[in-house]
């Protein structure tokens, strides 16, 4: 089962939002959930045409065994981006083994390019900007993982007491930070393991 959930971070449709893509195996009741951010958009982890295309800035890259340039239109996702990162997301294996998967596109939180402050959730919290403990891009990503965990606690189709946050590269650092600051999260340092 696929769900797409919009989390309104300030309670209004005009404020910042996270678009959570949640896959739940049909053969398990209330499965544990793997939660992680993705680099290039929810639509890239699976070719499913029903996944909403993001409107957030999408990085054009030729690194990480990816070439997102041809699928983008001015740093915005198109249908050509669908399934591009499916090899990095073993959805079928995870679902078959009875686990759920939730992900959010990291650029909806903070696109992390020079001058991206205005497109980041950080812009909605100006009172934090001059403090020594102001949150960085990785901190913002970790914060968003905690918001996904908050949502999962309200979803009766999954077991929010059994959650593992994951990520690789800088998104792995965000997962570790979320695990360190959120009592529900449990860090996992590899994204692929024998489940």
Feature-to-residue mapping (PLM):
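Cap/lid segment of the alpha/beta-hydrolase catalytic domain
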Residues: 37-154, 160, 194-195
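Short amphipathic alpha-helices and their capping/turn segments at secondary-structure boundaries
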Residues: 21-27, 91, 177-182
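Extracellular/periplasmic catalytic domains that process cell-envelope and extracellular macromolecules
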Residues: 13-15, 27-30, 94-96, 158, ...
